Amino acid sequence: MSLSLWQQCLARLQDELPATEFSMWIRPLQAELSDNTLALYAPNRFVLDWVRDKYLNNINGLLNDFCGTDAPLLRFEVGSKPLSQIISQTVTASVSAPSAPIVRVAAPSRPSWDNAAPQPELSYRSNVNPKHTFDNFVEGKSNQLARAAARQVADNPGGAYNPLFLYGGTGLGKTHLLHAVGNGIMARKANAKVVYMHSERFVQDMVKALQNNAIEEFKRYYRSVDALLIDDIQFFANKERSQEEFFHTFNALLEGNQQIILTSDRYPKEINGVEDRLKSRFGWGLTVAIEPPELETRVAILMKKADENNIRLPGEVAFFIAKRLRSNVRELEGALNRVIANANFTGRAITIDFVREALRDLLALQEKLVTIDNIQKTVAEYYKIKIADLLSKRRSRSVARPRQMAMALAKELTNHSLPEIGDAFGGRDHTTVLHACRKIEQLREESHDIKEDFSNLIRTLSS
């Protein structure tokens, strides 16, 4: 039985799983087949536990499909497979694989200042907030992959996920994860040189270096860190000199296996005003989206925040707030802080009626902004169709998919029941609305385009 069995499994898993999941969890695995046992080697315990928990049934099912009763036993281990296996497979692959053109890349010459006399030890401004850790980051379906990727980077900086690019709307937890990674790296190695900053700080530092004729010191500082964490990379847009310098810094860090993590409010290729060569490099490692939190995650965030403040928040109150404030975590926490402050000032118990009063203007604004009519108008404009098409009986995909999207958004962003949503879409049955919601949820898992459409529309409607 040859190791091509695992290659067959990989091919099927790549077809069946979303690309991000496959790249994050399956691709790093190494395999060794011996004595009717398939050993899968994971780079660390975190990956091993995740794969065994999430994909064990998938892998066993494929082994049974390919081998029937002769399927090998499956064993998981942390580490790498024996070197002899790697050499053997490399030789086999080189013989069996079709020849491909060999591209040789010249090693970049080291900057002249590298050959100068030893420089004084640099002092690093970490700027990592110790309050933001993985332990106090509330995980949900909307951010699960992003948290898992960040955790892996913290455990193995400079490894497979370099760079790590996190993107999503404002207030969804990207910055929290950046700090959590920084804290994780420094917890494992106390003297690690970890630098967190907003992209504008990089620009400001470069401008000062140019003004003070200290650009070589600037380069040495940024190219000698162990991990560079840059928030809101989209602010590099149209800053050509900054992009040029960051391009070379990026290359130097990657060459040195130093970790880079970037965040943005949009997918790399959608960042206008940034050079294509930079956008291409942003996607070299792993790119993960953070979605707006679903209801259960919003409730969990409120409960955890209340607990941190030693406040007892009744479950029904948390659900009341979470159902009405949906756009981002920052808005949720701000609303809860307001409720807590009002309760402390007045000495009153936190009830639904009290919350209605404390958040009166915020709730009124939210209800005014997000209506089914507004959703229909926004979706129609986004997909360049007519509102009448959404209400019609037409079933062509160019109309049906936007209609399903609008129904799913109505369920997510309003307090209307399924029958009420159905009535607003040409008198459709509530089961049609339920099917639309489930279909969009499924497509968000499978299609990057649908996921992006949903996030863009949520952002537009919640702004």
From Swiss-Prot:
Name assigned to this protein: Chromosomal replication initiator protein DnaA
Residue numbers spanned by region Domain IV, binds dsDNA: 344-463
Record GO terms (molecular function): ATP binding; ATP hydrolysis activity; DNA replication origin binding; lipid binding
SUPFAM superfamilies: P-loop containing nucleoside triphosphate hydrolases, TrpR-like
Family as reported in the entry's similarity comment: Belongs to the DnaA family.
Residue segments, region Domain II: 91-126
Subunit and partners: Oligomerizes as a right-handed, spiral filament on DNA at oriC.
Binding site residues for ATP: 171, 173-175
